[in-house]
């Protein structure tokens, strides 16, 4: 069972994926997590910024674990598409990727300085996902330079499809990206890896 601190981090990640970081207040996290009111600054002396950073790290680790568990690039693509497909359907298209939600807010002049550590964490998560994905593609026999290009392409395209699916309240963008990335990977894989 998770303690109050862990529940707060998970709750923050869940709220960010639906509302974004700016609209996720500590009071909302406390209510969502069921943590005691005075616990926020006890567990997060760095305040809301620390909580948001840890929520980004948590969400990043969740997807990184999926990437590491995948047998290969095609299985990884299928697993990620399925994860976001189920997430979008189960939340009536309210929940996207919390890392993307934080990143979209990077240009906000009002909070740029305060949000800088959170944005830096989000950038590091995207880089890590791309690196781990490239390693999957390399293990499948795709040359390293091409594997890194495909990993950035896959990450970027998937994030865009999630955003479009949310806005349109329709899975078509996700399905299209799934089909096209799958075809691209199949064309790139050596015969023995297909």
Swiss-Prot record:
Was identified as a high-confidence drug target. The keyword Lyase does not apply. The keyword 4Fe-4S does not apply. Pfam families: TetR_C_13_2, TetR_N. Residues 2-62 form the HTH tetR-type domain. It comes from Mycobacterium tuberculosis (strain ATCC 25618 / H37Rv). Keywords: DNA-binding, Transcription, Transcription regulation. It comes from the Bacteria. GO terms for molecular function: DNA binding. SUPFAM superfamilies: Homeodomain-like, Tetracyclin repressor-like, C-terminal domain. PANTHER family: HTH-TYPE TRANSCRIPTIONAL REGULATOR LMRA (PTHR47506:SF3), TRANSCRIPTIONAL REGULATORY PROTEIN (PTHR47506). This is Uncharacterized HTH-type transcriptional regulator Rv0196. Residues 25-44 bind DNA.
């Amino acid at each position: 069972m998770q303690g109050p601190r862990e529940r707060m981090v998970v709750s923050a990640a869940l709220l960010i994926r639906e509302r974004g970081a700016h609209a996720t207040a500590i009071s909302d996290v406390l209510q969502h997590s069921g943590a005691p009111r005075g616990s926020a600054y006890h567990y997060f002396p760095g305040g809301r910024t620390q909580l948001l950073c840890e929520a980004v790290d948590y969400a990043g680790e969740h997807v990184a674990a999926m990437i590491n568990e995948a047998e290969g690039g095609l299985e990884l693509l299928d697993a990620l598409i399925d994860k976001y497909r189920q997430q979008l359907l189960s939340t009536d298209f309210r929940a996207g990727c919390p890392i993307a939600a934080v990143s979209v807010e990077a240009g906000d002049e009002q909070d740029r300085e305060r949000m800088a550590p959170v944005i830096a964490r989000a950038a590091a998560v995207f880089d890590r996902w791309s690196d781990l994905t490239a390693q999957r593609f390399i293990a499948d026999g795709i040359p390293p330079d091409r594997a890194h290009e495909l990993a950035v392409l896959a990450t970027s395209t998937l994030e865009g499809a999630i955003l479009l699916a949310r806005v349109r309240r329709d899975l078509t963008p996700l399905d299209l990206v799934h089909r096209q990335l799958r075809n691209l990977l199949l064309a790139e894989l050596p015969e023995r890896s297909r």
